[in-house]
Amino acid sequence: MPSFDIVSKMNEVDLRNAVDNAVREVSTRFDFRGVEATIELKDLTVTLRSESDFQVRQLEDLFRNHCSKRNLSTSGVDIEDEPVHSGKFYTLTMTFKQGIDQPTAKEIVKYIKETKAKVQTSIQGDKVRVTGKKRDDLQETIALLKKSNIELPLQYENFRD
């Protein structure tokens, strides 16, 4: 039976490159001259630090632009609502999710079942396996999921006949 897996993975190399390019741009921008502004990456967590709330928001926008240039989706990112102020700096933390958590996996399965597609779904850890009798049914399911409003960036792998 044909099958494929739905996963949510973050390309760590592209994330590192987006951080490096954003840091490089911060060092050359006029509005960040004489200001201590940093962007750091550690274990899929990006920390933005600057001297004012407004500059942290500018760093966030700058970083999101560099992510979009590298085709990294920032839709599945856990981000603090307000920058945290401690001492001289404001800090904003963005955590990129890796894998599909249980509630989101159940939401994906429910969405596929509501569409009445001729496929079966099963949750396997941090991925969702979809099997069907025909390859066309699986491709139709992928098209439906791309149109859905699930907040995680989804990838489709292990497509087997």
From Swiss-Prot:
Keywords: Nucleotide-binding. The keyword Nucleotide-binding applies. InterPro entries: DUF520, UPF0234-like_C, UPF0234_N, YajQ-like_sf. Gene3D superfamilies: 3.30.70.860, YajQ-like, domain 2 (3.30.70.990). SUPFAM superfamilies: YajQ-like (SSF89963). CDD domains: YajQ_like. It comes from the Bacteria. It holds the Pfam family DUF520. GO terms for molecular function: nucleotide binding. GO terms for cellular component: cytosol. Nucleotide-binding protein. HAMAP family: YajQ. Belongs to the YajQ family. This is Nucleotide-binding protein LPC_0632. It comes from Legionella pneumophila (strain Corby).
